[in-house]
C-alpha cells in the first residue's frame, strides 16, 4: 500500500508515466516488509481455515493470506516480536544509524488498534536506540485478512522526495492522511 500511495502522489503531482515508474521503483528498492500471525485466515466463502497456527505459537514471515513463511515459533511478547521482525527488516535493507525510515504497522484484521500501537511503540524505541529516525508512520488496518490475528510491519528508507509524496494529501475509501 505505501508504494501505491507514493506512486499515486507522484502521478497527481503531474509526473510522467516514466517518472512515476522511476519513483515507484526507487521506493520499492528501499522498502521491506514482514508479517506475523497468531491465528490463521479463513476462506470468505466457506469459512474454512486456510492456515492453522497452533495455540501458543506464532508464524513469522507468513504471507498476506496466511501462507507459511519464516517458520513457527513459541509466542513472544509484543516487544520481543517487534524486535525479531524489525531486526530482520533492518538487515534486509542494510539500514544504518543516521538514516530516516517510514514505519507502517498494518493490523491483519483481528488485532486491536491498541495492540498495533504497542508494537509501533516498541519499533520506535528500538529504532531510536539504534540512531535511526522515524520520519513517517501509519498504524491501523489498511489491508486485512479475514479473521487473522497478527500484523504486517513495513519499513522504507525515506529521502525528501519520497517523504513529500508520502505526506501529500490522500483521500480514498481505505486510506486517508
Regions found by a protein language model. Name each.
Residues 29-41, 70, 134, 166, ...:
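Generic preference for hydrophobic/aromatic residues in regular secondary structure cores
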Residues 12-22, 53-64, 71-82, 132-146, ...:
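Hydrophobic transmembrane alpha-helix bundles
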Residues 3-5, 40-48, 57-69, 118-131, ...:
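Short, Lys/Arg-enriched charge-dense amphipathic segments
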Residues 1-2, 15-26, 55, 76-84, ...:
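Conserved active-site and cofactor/substrate-binding residues in soluble primary-metabolism enzymes
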Residues 48-81, 85-118:
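Glycine-rich phosphate/diphosphate-binding loops and the adjacent beta-loop-alpha structural elements
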Residues 88-177:
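C-terminal non-catalytic interaction/assembly regions of soluble proteins
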Residues 3-6, 10, 85, 89, ...:
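Buried hydrophobic packing segments
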Residues 1-65:
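Internal, active-site/partner-interface "lid" segment
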Amino acid at each position: 500500500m505505501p508504494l501505491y500511495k507514493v506512486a499515486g502522489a507522484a502521478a497527481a503531482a503531474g509526473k510522467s508515466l516514466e517518472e512515476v515508474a522511476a519513483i515507484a521503483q526507487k521506493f520499492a528498492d528501499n522498502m521491506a516488509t514482514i508479517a506475523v500471525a497468531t491465528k490463521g485466515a479463513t476462506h470468505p466463502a466457506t469459512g474454512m481455515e486456510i492456515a492453522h497456527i497452533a495455540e501458543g505459537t506464532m508464524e513469522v514471515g507468513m504471507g498476506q493470506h496466511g501462507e507459511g513463511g519464516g517458520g513457527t515459533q513459541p509466542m513472544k511478547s509484543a516487544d520481543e516480536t517487534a524486535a525479531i521482525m524489525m531486526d530482520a527488516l533492518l538487515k534486509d535493507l542494510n539500514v544504518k544509524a543516521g538514516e530516516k525510515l517510514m514505519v507502517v504497522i498494518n493490523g491483519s484484521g483481528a488485532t486491536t488498534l491498541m495492540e498495533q500501537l504497542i508494537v509501533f511503540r516498541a519499533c520506535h524505541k528500538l529504532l531510536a536506540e539504534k540512531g535511526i529516525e522515524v520520519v513517517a508512520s501509519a498504524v491501523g488496518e489498511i489491508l486485512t485478512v479475514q479473521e487473522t490475528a497478527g500484523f504486517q510491519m513495513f519499513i522504507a528508507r525515506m529521502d525528501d522526495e519520497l517523504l513529500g509524496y508520502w505526506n501529500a494529501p490522500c483521500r480514498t475509501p481505505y486510506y486517508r492522511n
